[in-house]
Every structure is written in structure tokens, then in C-alpha cells.
């Protein structure tokens, strides 16, 4: 009987030592230095993907796993602000990369995607956004339409 009890104790001790090597991992956000990263349930770092925060906002994780901030992401279709939050239902003014100076205006809909190559009605006015997503002004689309200096489509004769 004594040997059986000792064997059970030894078996329990071995089993508990094996359990020490198993690490439970909770998915979620973690700060690593100056960067925020997101881990899956299996402990792997999420990369090149969107993750939704508890407050409902969306953030993008770059190829390194770090949360992107203040930049274009996901094939330049989305923009995240200084807090890493996807811009939605907003205008954004960005330094113009096609000219030596100036700015371009972009509009992001409720899904956060930059409007590209289409007309968008905003507050009852129509704006056209070109292939880069920048708001167009002047004569556009083979000189068929005219958009004033603030991008609003002009209709009728003046």
C-alpha cells in the first residue's frame, strides 16, 4: 500500500512538472517598446492585417507586427491617424507627393476606404476623386465636368 501511494505521488509530481511547460496565451494588444502589437490565441504576432479594438475602432498591423500610425496602409486604400485608428467618414489633407508643394484632399467613407475613381456626394455636393484618391479640381473626365477650387462639381450655365 505504501508503494502504491508513493507511485501515485511520483506520477502526480511528474504530471505537474509537465504542465509547467505549457503556457496559456491570451490574445490581445501588447506594448513592445514604443510599438503596439497584437497576438493571436496561439501566441503568434498578427501581421499585415486589421484588428478591431474594444472601442470599435480599427487598427492596422504592419509586416513587422507593429501597429501603423499616421500613414497610408493596406495598398494605400486606408489611412490611420497618429493613434493608429482607421479614418472613417472624414476628409483628410495630405502633403502632395505628385508636386513639389501643396496638399491633396481625400475622403474616407464609413468603411474607411479612400474614395477612388468615382463621384461622391458629401453634404449634398458632388466631388470627384481620381485614381490616387485625391479630390480633383478644374476640368475633369475628358473635359466633361468642371469642379471648382474646393472640388465641388459646377452645374448649369453661369
Q: What is each of the regions a protein language model found here?
A:
Residues 2-158:
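Extracellular adhesion/carbohydrate-binding repeat motifs centered on closely spaced tryptophans
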